[in-house]
Regions:
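Bacterial N-terminal signal peptides that target proteins for export
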Residues: 2-15
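Bacterial N-terminal signal peptides
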Residues: 14-24
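Non-catalytic, mobile gating and regulatory segments of ester bond hydrolases
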Residues: 29-152, 156-303
Length: 303
């Protein structure tokens, strides 16, 4: 195999990567990894899946779970849909954000370079941040004082929900745990560090490629501006088993798939139906296991 990263440039790149890894050690998530409740994850998955359904079905699920549907809307420019539901008894409001209907086209069309965000000072994916700002402006007048806010979303909607959590946090709203499913990356290492105070769980299936996007590019190492996941990654394994990964470990998992291409065929591993199916047996009791890895640092550079 011919390396896509010339050997003469590997040395400096690996040194830069070592610096990146040393910086990331301090970016642990605020999530209590011993407090993962799969019944909670299943309910959030139901709400994430509901964002793809007609309004009548969203309303029915919300009422079944003790909520009233407050708003259901689709952003015209991006076709990202979301809903806001209010639970008076629990004094909780829930925001669920849908991804796009065609993930392959959406992920191929996005600009992969991060852009500075004036509101947060962070470098964020421009399209996801723009959608999050639109949702923020629409829900802000409907958010109630003294209520906690739950956020969830699938695919691109998960990335939008995560950025929305940052905007809400900075605006002083009380956030509950944020749970996303199959979410792509949306910021860099500095941005991930800013998320330490937010309890963010990213649920993934082992063969879902969307959470590995945009792909790791070793050429960005020199600028310490590589795309990086925020929060804690929960990997759904067979039956009752699961693994938990943070920053470095999550990145190392991604390097095993850097040469695979997103296609309609492997999107079967990305669908919410599979996420619900894999979470269900864990609601009665789950077993945390180590995530197997055969990582080799030279694999990043095509060696």
């Amino acid at each position: 195999m011919v390396s896509r990263f010339p050997s003469a440039r590997r040395g400096p790149a690996i040194l830069s990567l070592a610096l990146v890894l040393s910086c990331v050690i301090a970016t642990a998530s605020a999530t209590d990894t011993d407090g993962i409740d799969f019944s909670e994850l299943y309910e959030q998955a139901e709400f994430a899946a509901a964002a793809y359904r007609p309004e009548a079905e969203i309303r029915a699920l919300a009422e079944e779970r003790g909520y009233t549907l407050t708003l259901h809307h689709t952003l015209e420019a991006t076709q990202v849909a979301f809903f806001l539901a209010t639970g008076e008894a629990a004094k909780t409001q829930l925001i669920s954000i849908r991804g796009t209907s065609n993930v392959v086209n959406a992920m191929l069309d996005i600009s992969v370079k991060l852009k500075p965000d004036a509101d947060t000072g962070l470098r964020l994916h421009e399209g996801f941040a723009a959608a999050a700002k639109q949702v923020f402006e629409e829900v802000k007048p409907l958010l109630l004082q003294g209520y906690r806010i739950r956020l969830t979303g699938h695919s691109l909607g998960g990335a939008v929900a995560s950025i929305l959590a940052l905007y809400l946090d900075k605006a002083g709203f009380d956030l509950a745990r944020v749970v996303t499913f199959g979410q792509p990356k949306f910021t860099n290492i500095a941005g991930a560090a800013e998320f330490r105070r937010i309890d963010l769980i990213r649920v993934v299936t082992p063969a879902d490629l969307v959470p590995l996007l945009p792909p790791f590019d070793p050429l960005d190492i020199k600028d310490l501006d590589v795309y990086w996941h925020a929060g804690t990654e929960v990997v759904l394994l067979a039956d009752t088993e699961y693994a938990v990964l943070d920053g470095i470990d999550s990145m190392l998992r991604a390097t095993r798939f850097t040469r695979q291409t997103l296609s309609e065929e492997n999107l079967a591993y990305h669908r919410m139906a599979l996420y619900l199916e894999m979470i269900a047996p864990k609601t009665g009791g789950a077993v945390r296991v180590p995530y197997p890895t055969d990582f080799n640092i030279f694999n990043i550079f095509g060696g």
